[in-house]
C-alpha cells in the first residue's frame, strides 16, 4: 500500500469492477487517494518477469527492442533498451496550445493507473505506485491540449505526464508552477528511471481522450438537467398546455428516453393549475368557420419536448457506458500476456469508440441549444407568448428588456452549429504511413468539452428569460401560482439574480446562473441517467 492522508481511499485491485464514472469524477477533483492491493503488485511483478524472460530470448518485440512506428523493423542494441524508452518521451514532447485544466490532468493520471493495473503492459509495480504518489500529493503535469491524433493513443500529451514521472517538464504544485524536479524534491518522491517497455506503456493509450470525455459527459448530464428545468419554467411562463406530457402518449412510443423526459416534466407540473386543458376546449356548432381563443395544440418545441430530447438522455447514458468500458480497457501495444509471456501486437490504442461517441454528443449539444433557442423566441414575442411584452420588457418602449440577451444567445447557438461537425471523419495519414488511419478521438472530446461551455451559457440565458416571463405573469395575473417543483426552481433563481425592472447589464446574471448550474445550486429534478 502507499501512504495516504485525510482523504478517502480508492482501492485498485486490477479488475476494478466496482469503478463508476462518479469515482473518476471524484478522483479528478482530488477528493480521493489511490491505494493498491498487495496481490495486484505481486501480479504486476510476475508480468514484468515474463517480459524480462522474453527479452533474454532475443525475440523481436515492437517498441521494446525495435524502433517505433514506421521504424519497427530496426533492432535496438540490448544495452540501449532503457535509453530507448526515455528517448521516446523526448521526441514526443511536441504539444502545443493551452494546458489542460487540473481536473482533466488528474483524470488522465488516474486512467493511466487503471490501464496499467490490468497487468498486460509489462511495467514494474513501481510505475503505477509512483504515478499514484504524484496524484495523491497533488503534482499536476502541465499538458498541452493539442498534438494527439488518437492513434497509438494520445502519444504527444501523454509524454508530458510520463516525463514528469522522470523529473522532467513543468508541473503545478500547491497552485504554483515549477520544474517537475523541484516538486519531486518537495514531496520526497524519487524520479522514475524507465526500464524497457515502460515509456511506451505510459504514452500508448487512450487516457487523455478518455479523461476529457468522462468529465465532459458528467458535465453534460448536469447541464442537460438544467435544460429540462428551463423547459418547465418556459411552459409555465408561456401558459402552455401540459396535456402533451400525458404518460399514455409517451408510453406508446416505447423509447425510454422519451418516457423519462415526460416523467421529469410531469414531476415539475404535478400541481399546476395555470392553464385550461386543451382537451376541455368546446365550441358551439355553426355553419361558418369559427376561430377558437387558443389552439388545441402547442407548437413543437413545447408539445414535443420529450420526443425531441428523449434520445439525448439515451445518448448520455450510452456514452457513459462506452467511456467506462474504454477506461477499464487495456489500450496499450504491444501487450504482454502476464500468464504465458506471449507478446501480442494489436491496436487497442485506437480511440474510435471515444471519437464516435463524442462526435455524437456534439450533435446532442447542438440539438439542446436549438430547442432552447426556439423556446426563447416564443417568450420574446407577444404574438407567440400569450400576451407577454416584447423582449419581456418591464416597460415596453422605455426599456428594451432581454433583447440583447436573445441576440447573444443566438450567436452562441450558431457557434455550436458550426462546431458540431464530426472530427472522426477527418482521418489523415501520418508517421511514415504507419498511422495511415487515425481516430481523432481527442479532437472529438475536446470539441465537445468546448461546446459545453457555450451550451451552459445558453441554458443559463433560457432560465433567466423564463424566470422573467414568470415574474411578469405574477404581476399581471391575480393569484398566479406555480407548481411546487417549479416554484422551488424559481425561488432558487431569485436568490441569485433579481427580476429585470429596468435596462441594465445582464452578463453578470448569465455568469451567476451558469456557475449555479455547474455547482448544482439550483433546484432541478435529477435525471439519474
From Swiss-Prot:
It is found in: Cytoplasm. Pfam families: Lyase_aromatic (PF00221). There is a cross-link at residues 151-153 (5-imidazolinone (Ala-Gly)). One of its GO terms (cellular component) is cytoplasm. One of its GO terms (biological process) is L-histidine catabolic process to glutamate and formate. Keywords: Cytoplasm, Histidine metabolism, Lyase. Pathway: Amino-acid degradation; L-histidine degradation into L-glutamate; N-formimidoyl-L-glutamate from L-histidine: step 1/3. Contains an active site 4-methylidene-imidazol-5-one (MIO), which is formed autocatalytically by cyclization and dehydration of residues Ala-Ser-Gly. The modification 2,3-didehydroalanine (Ser) is found at residue 152. It comes from Dictyostelium discoideum. PROSITE patterns: PAL_HISTIDASE (PS00488). It catalyses: L-histidine = trans-urocanate + NH4(+). Belongs to the PAL/histidase family. InterPro entries: Aromatic_Lyase, Fumarase/histidase_N, L-Aspartase-like, Phe/His_NH3-lyase_AS. GO terms for molecular function: ammonia-lyase activity; histidine ammonia-lyase activity. SUPFAM superfamilies: L-aspartase-like. Its EC number is 4.3.1.3. This is hal-like protein DDB_G0273787/DDB_G0273081.
